[in-house]
């Protein structure tokens, strides 16, 4: 059974190389992600071709539930062309063997476009899909948002700077914080993390929402170097205003976390976005992912902000694909 032996350095290196070189690679499928989610149990499986080369892989994390069965989740996985459903079935079969009856479901949510045809094909292959059928519950009906604002930089082959991507009206918005004296620096040190965490917790308190502990982000720093993870910090006259965390992996840079201070931020979040996009341009990265939105509506503040930078329509993903392993527990725990 092709289950990755995490105690075999050569096997781990080969697996990681495949994950990082694959056009389907996702940072949440990297082995480092299990170090971030250190209260979950990692299980990693793969398929090889006749020459012994890895052709598909899935990194699962197993979490506890109120029952005696685990929840198995491959975030944004697997790493393969998921539209090849026969190959997907083979990989899922290996995953099910590796889970050995311990999980009630294997869930994965690849960044593949939704279509009625693909949705039906998955269901015909025995999978339960959660997408438009749960959309009325909003963006948090699924673990990952299904509607994402993604800037496709391959459409701008001659662009050298962020401003090259936009018409004059948008250029003016992006320039405004810099005209007002906002400056942005980036790195992956404890100093930048402390600055991020201050803005992150301030924003959470302002909106009355929970937030992750600093140890979570420290584990993220330990798992990913500055070529993969960068913290962007916007200041004006030495005063902290806004921050963001972005991760570069595979074909994209993903704007993952953000924070801002109370009061006048002089449009510093625009400056942070500008510099993150510049990082993508400087590294010839295909996509810049601003993450999820509630809806394509001016009533959604997330959409309004992200639409400044992404003029295309949101990408609608296929959503969650469940391989149900214990129907009774699944019916108890999964509510549509």
Curated annotation (Swiss-Prot):
Changing residue 144 to T: Slightly reduces activity. Changing residue 212 to K: Loss of activity. The keyword Transferase applies. Changing residue 216 to F: Reduced activity. InterPro entries: Acyl_CoA_acyltransferase, FEMABX, PG_Glycine_Bridge_Synth. Changing residue 305 to L: Reduces activity 6-fold. Changing residue 212 to M: Loss of activity. Changing residue 104 to F: No effect on activity. It comes from the Bacteria. Changing residue 140 to A: Reduces activity 5-fold. Keywords: Acyltransferase, Cell shape, Cell wall biogenesis/degradation, Peptidoglycan synthesis, Transferase. Changing residue 109 to N: Reduces activity 200-fold. PANTHER family: LIPID II:GLYCINE GLYCYLTRANSFERASE. Involved in the synthesis of the bacterial cell wall. Catalyzes the addition of alanine into the interchain peptide bridge of peptidoglycan precursor using aminoacyl-tRNA(Ala) as amino acid donor. This alanine is added to the epsilon-amino group of the L-lysine of the peptidoglycan UDP-N-acetyl-alpha-D-muramoyl-L-alanyl-D-glutamyl-L-lysyl-D-alanyl-D-alanine, in a ribosome-independent mechanism. Specific for UDP-N-acetyl-muramoyl-pentapeptide. Has no activity toward UDP-N-acetyl-muramoyl-tetrapeptide or UDP-N-acetyl-muramoyl-tripeptide. Also acts on L-seryl-tRNA(Ser). This is UDP-N-acetylmuramoylpentapeptide-lysine N(6)-alanyltransferase. It comes from Weissella viridescens (Lactobacillus viridescens). The lineage of its organism: Bacteria, Bacillati, Bacillota, Bacilli, Lactobacillales. The gene is femX.
């Amino acid at each position: 059974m092709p289950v990755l032996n995490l105690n075999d350095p050569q096997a781990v290196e080969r697996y990681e190389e495949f994950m990082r070189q694959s056009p389907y690679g996702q940072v949440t499928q990297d082995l480092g992600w299990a170090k971030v989610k250190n209260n979950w149990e990692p299980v990693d499986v793969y398929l090889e071709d006749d020459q012994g080369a890895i052709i598909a892989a899935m990194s699962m994390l197993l979490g506890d539930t109120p029952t005696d069965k685990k929840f198995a989740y491959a975030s944004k996985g697997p790493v393969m062309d998921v539209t090849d459903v026969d190959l997907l079935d083979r990989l899922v079969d290996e995953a099910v063997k590796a889970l050995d009856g311990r999980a009630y479901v294997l869930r994965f949510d690849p960044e593949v476009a939704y279509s009625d045809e693909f949705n039906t094909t998955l269901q015909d292959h025995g999978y339960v899909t959660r997408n438009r059928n749960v959309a009325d519950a909003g963006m948090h009906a699924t673990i990952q948002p299904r509607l994402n604002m993604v800037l496709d930089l391959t459409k701008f082959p001659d662009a050298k700077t962020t401003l090259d991507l936009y018409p004059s009206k948008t250029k003016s918005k992006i320039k405004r914080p810099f005209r007002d004296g906002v400056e942005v620096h980036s790195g992956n040190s404890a100093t930048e993390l402390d600055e991020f965490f201050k803005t992150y917790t301030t924003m959470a308190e302002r909106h009355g929402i929970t937030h992750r502990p600093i140890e979570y982000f420290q584990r993220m720093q330990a798992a990913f170097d500055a070529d993969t993870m960068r913290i962007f910090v916007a200041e004006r006259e030495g005063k902290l205003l806004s921050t963001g965390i972005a991760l570069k992996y595979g074909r994209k840079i993903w704007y993952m976390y953000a924070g801002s201070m109370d009061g006048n931020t002089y449009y510093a979040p625009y400056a942070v976005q500008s510099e993150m996009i510049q990082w993508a341009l400087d590294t010839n990265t295909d996509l810049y992912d601003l993450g999820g939105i509630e809806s394509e509506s001016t009533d959604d503040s997330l959409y309004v902000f992200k639409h400044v930078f992404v003029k295309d329509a949101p990408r609608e993903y296929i959503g969650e694909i469940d391989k149900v392993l214990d129907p009774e527990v699944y019916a108890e725990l999964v509510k549509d």
